[in-house]
Amino acid sequence: MTADEALERLLKSFRQYYDVKREDVLPPFSAEAEFHSCEEGYFLVKKAIISEAESNEYVFFYAAESLSAGDVKRLDGIAWEEGMRRINPHKDHKNSDISVFFLAENISADALKEVKKLKRYKSYNHSFHGYTHYKTVAFDTTTGALAYNRLGSEKKKLFGIMIKELNNNQEGRK
């Protein structure tokens, strides 16, 4: 499976809940997705709003033939800066998460280690105006190797079917 094929399959699962775009994305990324949600709590009638909670997620996808540790560091900085630029914390802001997916046909062992070490967090006004978590996942489309940071572990289930297919294809070749 190529990185572009894996990207298309991943984007298909995101399209259900996210606004996905392939054009006019921040270079060097291949695609972006955004999710916005606003929940309201009210008392007896909907006009008596007692609370609001706004949640956002900004997702960046990078698909290439290869990925090195240097690439991971460079892309990490670009994604974090752009994600932070898009966030507007205010009193009803709960969270705005930033996620990065690295898809490549050849990911170096150092790059996989680097992805696991990535850790970023931001709180706004001592969390009264929300917070930002940073999630990263790297997937080698040739071997099925998967690496993620602590918060990115919740995203690993998106790759389960692709990993099974890769394992079945490799067993069929033996």
Predicted regions and their residues:
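Switch/connector loops and helix/strand junctions flanking conserved nucleotide-binding motifs
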Residues: G70, S108-K113, L146-Y148
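Nucleic-acid nuclease catalytic cores
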Residues: H90-E114
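"Short basic amphipathic alpha-helical interaction patches in structured regions
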Residues: K73-I78, L112-K119
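Short, surface-exposed beta-edge/turn micro-motifs
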Residues: S55-Y58, N95-I98, Y134
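Charged, structured surface patches that assemble and position nucleic-acid processing machinery
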Residues: L118-K174
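A broadly used, surface-exposed interaction patch
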Residues: E57-R86
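N-terminal, charge-rich interaction modules
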Residues: M1-A64
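Short, flexible beta-strand-to-coil junctions
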Residues: F61-L67, A104-I107, T141-T143
